Amino acid sequence: MQLRLVEAAHILPVGAQYSTDDVRNGLALSPTYHRAFDNALIFLDENFVMRINPTKELQLTTLRLDGGLPDFKSYLGKKIHLPPDKRQWPESNMIRRANAYRRIAT
């Protein structure tokens, strides 16, 4: 049975210059974390660690929309699971471009 618990997410969004459908521009994320990633609430750093975007976190806190955020953040701050084949790892250049595209200071 396919439960669709994991989705393919582009690191550098499809509409951005230099984006590709290559596996090195992709991540496997749950639907919730995929939306958070696409909306720049979370980002991947060049050490392959998923992190919270402090600017977005502050916005949510200011608007009092931060309920559940501590639990959400508990899954962040660790290196993501990477494929055994390093040729399939996220490309550092895509990560840098994606963070610049989303205006995330790393």
Protein language model features and the residues they cover:
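A detector for short metal-coordination/catalytic motifs
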Residues: L3-T106
